[in-house]
Design a protein with these regions (language model features):
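Conserved glycine-rich cofactor-binding loop
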Residues: 10-11
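Conserved glycine-rich Rossmann-like NAD(P)H-binding loop of the short-chain dehydrogenase/reductase
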Residues: 24-40
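Conserved NAD(P)H cofactor-binding loop of Rossmann-fold oxidoreductase domains
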Residues: 80-88
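Short alpha-helical oligomerization interface
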Residues: 89-102
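Active-site helix of classical SDR
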Residues: 112, 148
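Residue(s) in the substrate-gating loop at a strand-loop-helix junction
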Residues: 132
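SDR active-site lid
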Residues: 154, 161-192
């Protein structure tokens, strides 16, 4: 049976991807900060979901948390990173920028590095990053969001280049949605 982990499955794109994976025969490890929302998702199909609730800003424990989830799943073939944060920040409140960087850069990198090393060790696997077209341009309304998405795009490209040097069945995919009607896209929707 195919096994996947979806980082950021408590809402939005990640939640819908987890549902699609289950519909297509996967067993899915779901992660997010809001455990109650993960439990609600698990209750839709209790035998197909495994919960690993944690915060990406806790990079010290990401490896332990992911390894625990992999043990529950008895392996993993696909890891989708769909977590992220971004707020409009016209006043340039540094705390908003810092939180965006901690999740979208630091946490993202910790998950990517773990996944890359795990899949390289088993010589097969697929890392999918849900980035954004917002990473292609700056934004006066959400400067750190767009900048962190640019980082993700470039980081995944770097991992893709590393994969070419390996003799394995390891894949890296960057998916760049445009504006999507999710809870994160709140406010006036002026990311771009």
């Amino acid at each position: 049976m195919k096994k996947a982990i979806v980082i950021g499955a408590s809402s939005g794109i990640g939640k819908e991807l987890a549902r699609l994976l289950v519909k297509n025969g996967y067993i899915v490890g779901i992660t997010g900060r809001r455990k109650n929302l993960l439990i609600d998702l698990k209750n839709e199909n209790p035998d197909k979901y495994f919960i690993g609730s944690f915060d990406l800003t806790d990079t010290y424990n990401i490896k332990t948390n992911l390894e625990s989830l992999v043990r529950q799943l008895d392996g993993v073939d696909l890891l989708i990173i769909s977590s992220g944060t971004g707020d409009t920040n016209d006043r340039l409140d540094f705390e908003i920028e810092k939180r965006t960087i901690e999740v979208n850069v630091t946490g993202f990198t910790a998950v990517c590095d773990w996944a890359f090393n795990y899949f390289a060790g088993q010589k097969t696997g697929h890392i999918v990053g849900i980035t954004s077209v917002a990473g292609l341009r700056g934004s006066r309304h959400a400067p750190s969001y767009n900048a962190t998405k640019a980082y993700q795009i470039n980081y995944l490209e770097g991992l893709h280049q590393k994969v070419k040097k390996l003799k394995s069945r390891l894949f890296v995919t960057d998916i760049r949605p445009g504006f999507v009607n999710t809870d994160m896209a709140k406010g006036d929707g002026l990311f771009w």
